[in-house]
Amino acid sequence: MSFEVFEKLEVKVQQAIDTITLLQMEIEELKEKNNTLTQEVQDAAGSREALVRENEQLKQEQHVWQDRLRALLGKMEEV
């Protein structure tokens, strides 16, 4: 009787070990995915900052061209 109980206990312990091993593997996979996603977020933030700077530069250039165009139109009206 005690041998059967020991065998059942051994099976349960082995199942617990297998479950723990699988969960550890899953945790490692999730950590890798998390690291990848963190890097993607950082890259996207950097790209966004670059686009914001470029947008500001283009707005400034647009204002310069608008001012030049207004000046040119003003000269044409004078003539």
From Swiss-Prot:
Pfam families linked: ZapB
InterPro entries: Cell_div_ZapB (IPR009252)
Metal-binding is among the record's keywords: no
GO cellular component: cytoplasm
Subcellular location: Cytoplasm
Keywords: Cell cycle, Cell division, Coiled coil, Cytoplasm, Septation
Parts forming coiled coils: 6-78
GO biological process terms held by the UniProt record: division septum assembly; FtsZ-dependent cytokinesis
Family named by the database record: Belongs to the ZapB family.
Quaternary data: Homodimer. The ends of the coiled-coil dimer bind to each other, forming polymers. Interacts with FtsZ.
Function field: Non-essential, abundant cell division factor that is required for proper Z-ring formation. It is recruited early to the divisome by direct interaction with FtsZ, stimulating Z-ring assembly and thereby promoting cell division earlier in the cell cycle. Its recruitment to the Z-ring requires functional FtsA or ZipA.
Name of the featured protein: Cell division protein ZapB
Record organism: Yersinia pestis
Higher taxonomy: Bacteria, Pseudomonadati, Pseudomonadota, Gammaproteobacteria, Enterobacterales
